[in-house]
Amino acid sequence: MRDTPLSNCERLFLLKAIKEKKRLDGRQTYDYRNIKISFGTDYGCCVVELGKTRVLSQVSCELVPPKDSRPTEGIVFFNLELSPMASPAFEPNRQSELLVTLNRQLERCLRNSKCIDTESLCVVSGEKVWQIRVDVHVLNHDGNLMDAASIAAISALSHFRRPDVAIQGRDVTVFGPEERDPIPLSIYHMPICVSFAFFLQGSFLLVDPCEREERVKDGLLVIAMNKHREICSIQSSGGIMLLKEQVLRCSKIASVKVSEITELINKALENDKKVRKEGGKFGFAESMPKERITTLKRDEAPVEMTDVKETADDIVQRTETTTETVPSPILVATGTAQIGEGIVNSWGLDEDEDDELQTEDRKTDEVVVITDSEEEEVVILNDQKSKKTSKQK
């Protein structure tokens, strides 16, 4: 694991802020960061966001032979992975001390606490049992990976559904979700880890430390507890000596935090179950906030609606068509009818057209006087008549 160096100025600034009971993100000493739990479209897929720390948990199952020491119990397997995508400090394909510690702590919290009924996972004693595999992937590391991993793992186990089976003799039939409804796991309680970081030789205490606060810590205490105030595991690291009063104080704080987180998990499970039952949209895509560009957004212009009715009435009155009187035919004789008697004749010409016709008639009645110049330009069409007139002269 390649640790990113922390400058002395940053270290001194963090320790000075902790002495003054201040934190980088504005939280109080015992405050958790915002926790968001969302489930995928498939059962057993869960993403937990603890501030900027993001963890994905996926649960799967398969039929395997049981262990020789426990032929009537199923198998629960946990696997936690740290990829360079989460932090540049994580090296690929190499088990670091942090990875081994997190895996052991997760198994001690969930498997050794007997929170899952492993006997209900037995299909055929000594032959077939269900193996439940929990894969936890760290998507982004911003401190307190243990708490986020425990919340994601127990939420995914509570959300998971295994296929139903039928046994006829030695034949085992596994039904798909279309044939029979999947069966949820039998979970007795929900153990959740709560981390406490100690600074300056145990003089100061912080709950849910972030990544920078973890770099300057002197010791770490992780308490796994359920909402019934039952301690499932306790682990201390860092080589710091803690007093009995400090441990009891941390356990009281952990009981309050665990009850709040358990209520949040149950609420998220109920909401997902309700949405699936109603046939609504569910999955990671619906839980992610939609970020849209709002630079070109225009504010709605105010519209006055006071005189709308009056103007509408005026428009209707203007556009109303005038009722035309249609004459009824008058029967003059057999086979002859007269239409339009007693109505003004609309076939006549307009006054302007009458004026134009009168002016044209006046122009045609006028006498045209032809001058000498115009006589020379006259073309004679009949040659014979012109010859006779010349002889008489």
Curated annotation (Swiss-Prot):
It comes from the Eukaryota. One of its GO terms (biological process) is U4 snRNA 3'-end processing. It is found in: Cytoplasm; Nucleus; Nucleus, Nucleolus; Nucleus, Nucleoplasm. Gene3D superfamilies: GHMP Kinase, N-terminal domain (3.30.230.70). Keywords: Cytoplasm, Exosome, Nucleus, RNA-binding, rRNA processing. Its main location: cytoplasm. GO terms for molecular function: mRNA 3'-UTR AU-rich region binding. Disruption phenotype: Morpholino knockdown of the protein affects brain and neuromuscular development. Morphant embryos have small heads, small or absent eyes, truncated bodies, and reduced and damaged myofibers. Motor axons fail to migrate properly to the neuromuscular junctions. The brain has abnormal morphology, the cerebellum and hindbrain are absent. GO terms for cellular component: cytoplasmic exosome (RNase complex); nuclear exosome (RNase complex); nucleolus; nucleoplasm. The keyword RNA-binding applies. Residues 1-268 are annotated as: ARE binding. Component of the RNA exosome complex. Belongs to the RNase PH family. Non-catalytic component of the RNA exosome complex which has 3'->5' exoribonuclease activity and participates in a multitude of cellular RNA processing and degradation events. In the nucleus, the RNA exosome complex is involved in proper maturation of stable RNA species such as rRNA, snRNA and snoRNA, in the elimination of RNA processing by-products and non-coding 'pervasive' transcripts, such as antisense RNA species and promoter-upstream transcripts (PROMPTs), and of mRNAs with processing defects, thereby limiting or excluding their export to the cytoplasm. This is Exosome complex component RRP45.
